[in-house]
Amino acid sequence: MPHHYILTMFGLLPVATNISTWWNFGSMLLSCLMLQVTTGFFLAVHYTANTNLAFSSIIHIMRDVPYGWMMQNTHAIGASLFFICIYIHIARGLYYGSYLNKKTWMSGTTLLITLMATAFFGYILPWGQMSFWAATVITNLLTAVPYLGTSLTIWLWGGFAINDPTLTRFFALHFILPFIIISLSSLHILLLHEEGSSNPLGTNSDTDKIPFHPYHTYKDLLLLTLLLTLLLLTTFFLPNIMNDPENFSKANPLVTPQHIKPEWYFLFAYGILRSIPNKLGGALALVASILIIMTMPFTHTAHVRSMTFRPMSQLMFWTLISTFMTITWAATKPVEPPFMMISQTASMIYFMFFISNPILGWMENKIMKTM
C-alpha cells in the first residue's frame, strides 16, 4: 500500500475532540510492544536456553556483546513500562466506561492474560535464584487442579522437576507469544474502530470529531517522547532498580530464598494468592483477580457511561487503585502479621469494587431521578 494511502487513512480517521491524555496509552503500548520485540530478538540471538549456560549467557550479553547491556536493561525496564502503561490503560477503561464496548474489552482482557504469561516466561529465562523459585512456586499451583493437577504440572515441566526441558519450552513460549500479542492487538484496534473511541463525558462523539492526523498524532508523540526519556534515564542511571538482588545469583535448587516473590507487576495477583491459606482457594483467587474485569460490561447498571458525574463510583474506583497499590506493597513483605492481615483486608476490598459497582450504579440512577 503506497504511503499516501496510509496517511490518508489516518488523516480521515475521526476522533472525538475532547479525549484527554488518558487515551494516549494505547499508542504507548504499541510503541512498548515494538520496542520489546526488537530488543527481545537481539537478546534471543545471544541467549542459550540451557540450565547450565543460561545464567552465563546473560553475563556474556551484559559484558561481551556490543551494547548488550543496553539491550538487556532496555528489555527489562521496557517490560515494567509496558505494565505501567497497561494498568493505566485498564484504569482509564474502568473509569470512563470503555468496557461497554464489549468486543474490545474482551479482546483487551485476553491481551492482558497473554502479556502476563509472556512476562512470566521471560522472568524465568535468566535462571537466577528468584527466577527458578518463582517458576517452581507459580507452576506448582497447577497441582491444585483436582484429579488432573499432577499430570498437568509434570507435562508443563517436561519431567518431575523444573529442569532443562522446562527452560527450553519457556524460552520457546516467550519467543512465540509476542507474535500472538501483535495479532491480538490488531484485532483489538480493529474492534475498537468498529464503534470508535469513547470520551471523558461518556457521550456520543459523532457530532464533534476531528481527524486523527495531525492533531492526535502530535499529542501521542509528546507522551511517547516523555516515555522514551523516562525509559532511557532509568536504563542509563538506575538499570537495576526493578531487579531482585536474589536474581544476581545462579539458580540453586538446594537453597530456598528467604522470601519468594515475582516481578512487581504480578505482586497484586500474588498478594491475593498468598492471602488465602489454601492452595486451591488461592489459585482460584489469583485467576479471579484478573478474569473479574471481564464481568464489567455485564454488571454496568448506571444510566451514565463515565464515572465523571458519579461521585460514589469515583470513591470506589480510587479505593480500588489504592487497594491495588496496598496489595502490591504487602506482597513484597514476609508471610507474617501484620502483612497477612493487610493483604487479606485489601484483597476483600479489591473484589468488593466489582461486586458493589452495579449496586452503586443503581443507587446513582435513583438519586438522579429524584433531582
UniProtKB/Swiss-Prot annotation:
A ubiquinone binds at residue 193. The keyword Transmembrane applies. One of its GO terms (cellular component) is mitochondrial inner membrane. Heme b b562 binds at residues 75, 174. One of its GO terms (molecular function) is metal ion binding. It holds the Pfam family Cytochrome_B. Heme 1 (or BL or b562) is low-potential and absorbs at about 562 nm, and heme 2 (or BH or b566) is high-potential and absorbs at about 566 nm. SUPFAM superfamilies: a domain/subunit of cytochrome bc1 complex (Ubiquinol-cytochrome c reductase), Transmembrane di-heme cytochromes. The cytochrome bc1 complex contains 3 respiratory subunits (MT-CYB, CYC1 and UQCRFS1), 2 core proteins (UQCRC1 and UQCRC2) and probably 6 low-molecular weight proteins. It is found in: Mitochondrion inner membrane. Heme b b566 binds at residues 89, 188. This is Cytochrome b. Belongs to the cytochrome b family. It comes from Casarea dussumieri (Round Island keel-scaled boa). Its main location: mitochondrion. One of its GO terms (biological process) is mitochondrial electron transport, ubiquinol to cytochrome c. It is a multi-pass membrane protein. It comes from the Eukaryota. Keywords: Electron transport, Heme, Iron, Membrane, Metal-binding, Mitochondrion, Mitochondrion inner membrane, Respiratory chain, Transmembrane, Transmembrane helix, Transport, Ubiquinone. Binds 2 heme b groups non-covalently. Its cofactor is heme b. The chain crosses the membrane at residues 25-45, 69-90, 105-125, 170-190, 218-238, 280-300, 312-332, 339-358.
